[in-house]
């Protein structure tokens, strides 16, 4: 809240959110809620791409709330940026229409922002730029899966439980051997692993880019909406380890701790 920030005599952290999810307006709360729980004052800055068509979006909402990367960093650069996923794992990165603009933004953010968080597809994209390409699956990895922290003393992972769960919703993964090779070569630091999902949380060696291939921000309602959407396609299995009759969010602590860092 701006008035509370003024009374606390602190400057809110300006966090850019590059939202490329379909039906982006409906998705916004998934990020706003955990960010709002931070003890720090957060000013979300919604960012749009100039080369993305936003076919499923409310364009009035997009144009009223979202600004370009250049506008978001003028006159002062952002403190950090979150880049969402997008259901485009089947495409080679260079085939994505907005790939060049995406690369420009993440390269500039690495120099101007304290940290970049890439979720799901954005995490894959950052891994690709670090030298590890995704492997596309025949079937969607969908459900809630256990992960194990690999670096308990890490500034981020040290706040997490040694084992925790997180939603996954993706058609791709990163080969274990290539990820381990990237760590040996000093390109990536591996932070969390799941037996059925592979290396899911990792970071660049300079700790300025954090990649999370899961969807810690998802609510139960978001998963249910994806189930309904997938039913129409008819080619996606039901989510694993997820009770459709329960409203419990068992990954809440992981989500909240992640977004409060």
Language-model region placement:
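Amide-donor transfer/coupling interface in amidating biosynthetic enzymes
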Residues: 1-51, 66-67, 73, 77, ...
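Short, glycine/acidic-enriched capping/hinge loops at junctions between secondary-structure elements
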Residues: 27-30, 56-59, 93-94
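N-terminal beta-loop-helix "entrance" segment that forms/cooperates
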Residues: 50-64
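Helical hinge/lid and interdomain linker segments adjacent to catalytic or ligand-binding clefts
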Residues: 60-69, 93
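Cysteine-nucleophile active-site neighborhood
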Residues: 78, 83-154
């Amino acid at each position: 809240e701006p008035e509370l920030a003024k009374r606390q005599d602190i400057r809110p952290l300006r966090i850019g959110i590059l939202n490329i999810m379909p039906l982006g307006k409906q998705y916004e709360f998934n990020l706003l809620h955990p960010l709002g729980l931070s003890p720090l004052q957060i000013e979300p800055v919604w960012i749009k791409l100039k080369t993305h068509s936003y076919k499923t979006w409310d364009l009035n909402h997009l144009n009223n709330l979202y600004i370009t990367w250049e506008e978001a960093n003028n006159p002062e650069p952002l403190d950090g940026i979150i880049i969402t996923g997008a259901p485009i794992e089947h495409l080679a990165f260079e085939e994505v229409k907005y790939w060049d603009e995406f690369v420009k933004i993440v390269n500039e953010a690495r120099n101007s922002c304290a940290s970049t968080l890439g979720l799901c597809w954005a995490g894959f994209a950052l891994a690709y730029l670090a030298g590890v390409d995704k492997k596309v699956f025949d079937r969607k990895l969908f459900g809630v899966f256990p992960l194990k922290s690999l670096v308990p003393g890490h500034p981020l992972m040290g706040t997490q439980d040694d084992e925790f769960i997180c939603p996954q919703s993706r058609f791709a993964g990163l080969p274990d051997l290539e990820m381990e090779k990237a760590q040996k070569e000093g390109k990536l630091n591996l932070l969390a692993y799941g037996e059925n999902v592979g290396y899911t949380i990792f970071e660049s060696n300079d700790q300025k880019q954090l990649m999370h291939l899961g969807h810690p921000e998802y609510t139960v309602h978001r998963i249910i909406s994806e189930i309904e959407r997938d039913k129409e396609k008819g080619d996606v299995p039901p989510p694993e380890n997820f009770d459709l009759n329960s409203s419990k969010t068992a990954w809440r602590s992981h989500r909240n701790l992640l977004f409060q860092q």
